[in-house]
Amino acid sequence: MLKSNNASETAARKVGDKTAKKVFFRRRKGCPLSVPHAPVIDYKNPELLIKFVSEGGRMLPSRITNVCAKKQRKLNNAVKIARILALLPFVFQAK
């Protein structure tokens, strides 16, 4: 029994040595528009839409904004409608 116990201890040490290295793990943030009290995506809310548009007037990708695919499509459509109705500019001017 001592031999099997020693073998398990050495195996645990080997595993422990591998896990002793600190592994960087970035926690993935959830969709900011899917939380319970999130604002409704609507073309009549330019304050919300402007947060998802870059300084040049382009839509920010979901990998930067952490918005899920379903909400990203809704945002794209809302921004397009808001631009047509002149609630948002097509191109932001440099200051």
From Swiss-Prot:
Keywords from UniProt, A to Z, are: Ribonucleoprotein, Ribosomal protein, RNA-binding, rRNA-binding
One MF term from GO for this chain?
small ribosomal subunit rRNA binding
Q: Which InterPro entries match?
A: Ribosomal_bS18, Ribosomal_bS18_CS, Ribosomal_bS18_sf
Q: Name one GO biological process term.
A: translation
Keyword set includes DNA-binding:
no
The GO cellular component terms are: cytosolic small ribosomal subunit
Gene3D superfamilies named in the record: Ribosomal protein S18
By sequence similarity, the record places it as follows: Belongs to the bacterial ribosomal protein bS18 family.
Q: What do we know about how this protein assembles, alone or with others?
A: Part of the 30S ribosomal subunit. Forms a tight heterodimer with protein bS6.
Kindly give the PANTHER family that the UniProt entry links to this protein.
30S RIBOSOMAL PROTEIN S18 (PTHR13479), SMALL RIBOSOMAL SUBUNIT PROTEIN BS18M (PTHR13479:SF40)
Functional description taken from the UniProt entry: Binds as a heterodimer with protein bS6 to the central domain of the 16S rRNA, where it helps stabilize the platform of the 30S subunit.
What is the recorded name of this protein? Small ribosomal subunit protein bS18
- Recorded source organism is Rickettsia massiliae (strain Mtu5)
